[in-house]
């Protein structure tokens, strides 16, 4: 895809120039933030006592990003993703991930996501069911990018890569 080609062409240069490792999470996070502007029902939080009795629609995107640690999965929150560039998002995810692995996240850094992304693809996952992280109202599960055979002009070719996304 265009994203994979862009990353392959630029990741080494950007790492050298900025110190930021270009992955896929920054681009997917930015794409989600742009889509959430147009789909307010997916960018909401469920609030109230018990199971929640109020849906609050947000005009900002505070994105929860699942991070695996020795103690389990945590979801630190990148605030105001809609106002960030892809490299800024990558940097924020990296910094929060390091804090998570060092058990140094504050409660504020782990609460208030309006939408969450879980990337099981880093573990080779081909499919799965992401678990909604309240108070957010939606989650995106990303999975491994794999080469797949495609029939092109009657011949089987392995020239396309695909991933499964679910919510």
Model regions: which residues?
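C-terminal catalytic/motor cores of large multi-domain enzyme assemblies
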Residues: 1-167
């Amino acid at each position: 895809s265009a994203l994979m080609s862009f990353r392959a062409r630029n990741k080494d240069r950007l790492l050298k120039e900025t110190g930021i490792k270009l992955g896929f999470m920054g681009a997917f996070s930015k794409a989600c933030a742009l889509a959430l502007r147009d789909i307010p029902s997916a960018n909401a939080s469920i609030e109230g006592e018990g199971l929640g009795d109020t849906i609050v629609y947000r005009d900002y995107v505070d994105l929860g990003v699942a991070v695996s640690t020795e103690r389990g999965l945590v979801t630190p929150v990148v605030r105001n993703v809609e106002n960030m560039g892809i490299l800024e998002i990558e940097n924020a995810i990296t910094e929060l991930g390091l804090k998570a692995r060092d058990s140094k996240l504050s409660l504020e850094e782990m609460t208030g996501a309006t939408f969450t992304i879980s990337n099981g693809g880093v573990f080779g996952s081909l499919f799965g069911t992401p678990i909604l992280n309240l108070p957010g109202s939606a989650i995106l599960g990303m999975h491994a990018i794999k080469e797949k055979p495609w029939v092109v002009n009657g011949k089987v070719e392995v020239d396309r890569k695909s991933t499964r996304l679910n919510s």
